């Protein structure tokens, strides 16, 4: 049993498996070299599938890393919510916004296109708003319970 648990932890950080997505994102935010404001608006009854949690964690980690390396920002906002926005069905929405210089792109060959590919496996999508001069806002959406 322990070896199976150890193997499964190789695919997800222990905090994610032991304490869930919110704790995992809190940990990422605390370790960021740029101050991160973490805002969440989640339904109390929300239970996410493990693959959704892993993808959301991975996307957040990559976006925070990209902001720290490339944005020139001095503040980041990380948002996590589950909502419908008037659309049919519920979705998990993860948004990272920084006050940096902008210029991020979803073009092939850029790191963000790989995140979009990862989300597409869950029928999710990634949207990037990053005008020259900033700010950059990246929004990941994954449908829940469809």
Task: State what each model feature region is.
Residues 1-146:
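Coiled-coil dimerization/phosphotransfer module
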């Amino acid at each position: 049993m322990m070896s199976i648990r150890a193997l499964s932890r190789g695919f997800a950080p222990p905090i994610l498996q032991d304490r869930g997505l919110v704790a995992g994102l809190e940990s990422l935010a605390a370790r960021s070299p740029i101050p991160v404001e973490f805002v969440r608006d989640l339904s109390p009854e929300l239970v996410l599938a493990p693959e959704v949690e892993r993808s959301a964690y991975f996307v957040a980690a990559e976006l925070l890393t990209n902001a720290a390396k490339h944005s020139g920002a001095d503040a980041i906002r990380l948002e996590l919510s589950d909502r419908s926005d008037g659309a049919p069905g519920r979705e998990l929405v993860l948004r990272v916004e920084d006050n940096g210089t902008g210029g991020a792109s979803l073009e092939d060959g850029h790191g963000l296109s790989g995140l979009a590919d990862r989300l597409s496996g869950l029928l999710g999508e990634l949207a990037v708003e990053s005008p020259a001069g900033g700010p950059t806002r990246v929004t990941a959406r994954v449908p829940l319970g469809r």
